[in-house]
Amino acid sequence: SYMFYLKISPVRMQIKVVSKKADISNHLDKIQEAIRREQDERCKVLLMDYYNLIRRIGLKEAVTRRFFIVFAYEPIPGSSKKNEEKDAVNQLEIAERTARTYLMQCGNNVVEHENPDSFMAEVLYMLLNRKTSTETPFSARAAAEVEKYIAEGDANAIPISAFLLPEQMDFGKAAYCRIDGLYYSYFMIPSTGYKTQVTAGWLSLLVNAGEGIDVDLFLSKEPKEKIQFQLGRQIRINRSKMKETSDTNTDFDDIDSAVRAGYYLKDGLANNQDFYYINTLITITADSREELEWRTNEMKKLMLSQDLILKP
């Protein structure tokens, strides 16, 4: 299960979910080709109905999602920096193979790439150029930049930013920013914004929120001994507060809830579970400011209906 993987996963990890409008043009082209080759007029009518259905759904509802797991290099304390790059590559490759093995055991399909460097460059380009990347692939952008620098006689000094950075970035507004012609707003779920009890699969609400809604989960594993010590101290402090507080006081329920939560975490650690901090970042994108405001309001309503709070 995923719990077994979390026991041996890196200390810091990011799970990124990117949702964007699905490209159904290739599928529609195949249907049109089938209509042209079909001899039976009745079958042509059925194929045409199917074509219109796919086109109608694609314009409104078709969304494609990509799931990424991101690892950060964790240098070993006291290690030499002489071979730091080599050590980082080895550590990250081991983390990737381990994650791939455990995810496949859980029934997930993990996409493999012949050239990992090219794949990562394309992903970074897509994330920074959400709009341009749908029209100009990374290979075309890279070729154009190389050709430009060669023409200028400076082919050996091409910065990495020339291949990845968007042509337009505007951070002049507090409520949103504009990158590559798209409007972005960023929100988070504060520590008090989660439900106290959730069912399995509660994150599907965020993952399936719709086009233009990205979710980032940042996980950080804490040393078990450190957390056990902090929990024990905080439980003792809260129990002392309870003795000094009347059960009719409004603070009594909050303190009682904190004590019970502390014991819940303590029992989990005693049963060989690990303690993780999790931060949830939600990114909303749109083609216009009006559409961004509408998506933001709808997302806040959706979260509120599930007792979740969204903060900028």
Language model features with spans:
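Extended, folded cores of ATP/NTP-driven motor/assembly subunits in large transport
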Residues: S1-P312
